[in-house]
């Protein structure tokens, strides 16, 4: 009886080790930074210094005609990559100038700003 039980356990173990790796989706850079409190803190500080203080206001309070970045009604850019492009390149014929990679840590800082905005954004349908 014990030999049968041990054989079944070994067989089950071998079947479980079929060599196939489980498929897990890689996190995006925004998802990675959203899970990192230090990255979110840096994103918030950069947002307050570069975005909120100039045009967009702090967490939902817009200034002048700039977009509220914490709601779901974005006129320009829906995906993280589109938002990245808008911030780096700007929007022609608007007050939104392109920042390029002019952050102290380059593109990583911009991704941290995007992660912060996404983290604080109200849930979208």
What is the predicted role of each segment?
Residues 19-46:
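Electrostatic cytochrome c docking/interface patches
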Residues 18, 52, 56, 123-125:
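Sequence contexts marking disulfide-bonded cysteines in secreted/extracellular proteins
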Residues 33-34, 57-88:
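Gly/Gly-Pro-rich "capping" loops immediately C-terminal to redox-active cysteine motifs
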Residues 2-8:
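Sec-dependent signal peptide recognition
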Residues 38, 42, 46, 78-82, ...:
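Extracytoplasmic/secreted proteins, especially bacterial periplasmic and envelope-associated proteins
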Residues 63-69, 88-121, 125:
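Axial heme c-ligation environment in periplasmic c-type cytochrome domains
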């Amino acid at each position: 009886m014990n030999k049968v039980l041990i054989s079944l356990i070994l067989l089950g173990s071998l079947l479980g080790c079929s060599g196939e790796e489980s498929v897990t989706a890689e996190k995006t850079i925004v998802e990675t930074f959203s899970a990192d409190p230090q990255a979110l803190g840096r994103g918030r500080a950069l947002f307050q210094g570069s975005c909120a203080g100039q045009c967009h206001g702090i967490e939902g309070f817009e200034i002048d005609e700039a977009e509220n970045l914490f709601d779901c009604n974005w006129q320009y850019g829906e995906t993280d990559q589109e938002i990245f492009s808008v911030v780096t390149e700007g929007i022609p014929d608007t007050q939104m100038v392109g920042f390029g990679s002019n952050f102290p840590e380059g593109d990583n800082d911009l991704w941290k700003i995007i992660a912060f905005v996404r983290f604080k954004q109200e849930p979208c349908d």
